[in-house]
Amino acid sequence: MANKLINIETSSRAEVDQKITAMRAGGKILGNLLRDLREYVEPGMTGKQIDAWVRKEIVKRGAGVAYDMLEEEFPGAICISVNDALVHGAPTDEPLEEGDKVSFDLDLYYDGYFTDSAFTMIVGTKANPAVKKMLQVTESSMWEGIEQVKPGAHIGDIGHAVEQVLRKGHLGVIENYIGHGIGKSMHEHPEVPNYGKKGHGYKLVEGDTICIEPMSCLGKPANFVDKDSNWTVRMKDGSIGCHCEHTILVTHDGYEVLTLAD
């Protein structure tokens, strides 16, 4: 299932340009949709209500529901992970409450290519200070990882940068769920862990597209898949988990974030 990335070394310039054009357009749709989702969410809404809105918006904006294309179909258009749920949260009928932590992870399919992005927010206006700090540190770790991206950089450079920020912030580092390449498939080579050693791992090439997605927790990093949904990943100690993500293009002299909003 892990396909090689399309890059300048292995593909024609036309093929690389086609990929970049499609992923820029799809990424912009995704970024704008997640921006609007952040404004849409409020206490009292259920996961299934939010999921229905997201599904409608994906279609309205001209993209495809990526999770409908999985071999083992996910029960929703977006992953919604509340409180102790870390990632892959299946939408439920439980209403969100003031102060809940909720992570949203969304893949889109557009013009033959996938893009992927995630963010974590606190519902309403009441924020637990420790949870608020976790969100800030985790997002900072993502941007520190992104700053390492350029031709010739190693995957280990990214993981090392992410890990250092998370550990300095006294957060648990999730190691069994990681970032990945993306393009014609949702998950492609290379794997992009949130830990690593500088100078180790796959060496990035101009035209590569990867997802950098730190995951952290306030407690110990052990986690499990909830048997009720067979999808939702929860923290074993019941602590709060956090997740953020962007799709990144390796450019000739650095990087471009494809999933930013306007």
Protein language model annotation of sequence segments:
Residues 1-262:
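Active-site neighborhoods and metal-handling regions in enzymes and metal-associated proteins
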